[in-house]
Amino acid sequence: MPFVELETNLPAERLPPGLPLKLCEATATILGKPAERVNVTVRSGMPMVLAGSAEPCAQLLVSSIGVVGSAQQNQGHSARFFDFLTTELGLGPERIVIRFYPLEPWQIGKNRTVMTFL
């Protein structure tokens, strides 16, 4: 069950239409998870500074069980997420940062229990 949070200082009107759904589909493909299990949040117009500059930028937080737990996995994921974000947001790769967080099944609650028991 991946969780993806995109934060950017770009105003909402500069984001492409349907970005949350596109990011959901891209995440499913990149991480090899069904889109029905992907959770996406997009926050625009955030006050942000990246590398000492308030120029347009974005950060992506990717949390998931079993697919973001190694440098080798995340190197491949990073390249594919960067391709998606630079295309969709019109930002250079130097204005984007990605953080990966591996999760354990007991850390995600769903249907009145945790994923460990589902």
From Swiss-Prot:
The family database entries (InterPro entries) matched by this protein are listed as: Macrophage_inhib_fac (IPR001398), Macrophage_inhib_fac_CS (IPR019829), Tautomerase/MIF_sf (IPR014347)
Superkingdom, natural source:
Eukaryota
Subcellular compartments:
Cytoplasm
UniProt GO cellular component terms? cytoplasm; extracellular space
Q: Which family does it belong to?
A: Belongs to the MIF family.
- Disulphide bonds annotated for this chain are none
Protein name, UniProt field: D-dopachrome decarboxylase
Q: Is the keyword Metal-binding in the record?
A: no
Q: What is its main location?
A: cytoplasm
| One Pfam family cited in the UniProt record for this chain | MIF
Query: Which GO molecular function entries does the Swiss-Prot or TrEMBL record give?
Result: D-dopachrome decarboxylase activity; phenylpyruvate tautomerase activity
Entry EC number(s): 4.1.1.84
Modification N-acetylproline occurs at: P2
Could you tell me which SUPFAM superfamilies the record lists for this protein?
Tautomerase/MIF
Q: Has keyword Nucleotide-binding?
A: no
Q: What does this protein do?
A: Tautomerization of D-dopachrome with decarboxylation to give 5,6-dihydroxyindole (DHI).
Enumerate the UniProt keywords alphabetically: Acetylation, Cytoplasm, Lyase, Melanin biosynthesis
The record's section on PANTHER family has:
D-DOPACHROME DECARBOXYLASE
Q: Which reaction does it catalyse?
A: D-dopachrome + H(+) = 5,6-dihydroxyindole + CO2
> Per the UniProt entry, what is one GO biological process?
melanin biosynthetic process
On subunit structure and binding partners, the annotation says: Homotrimer.
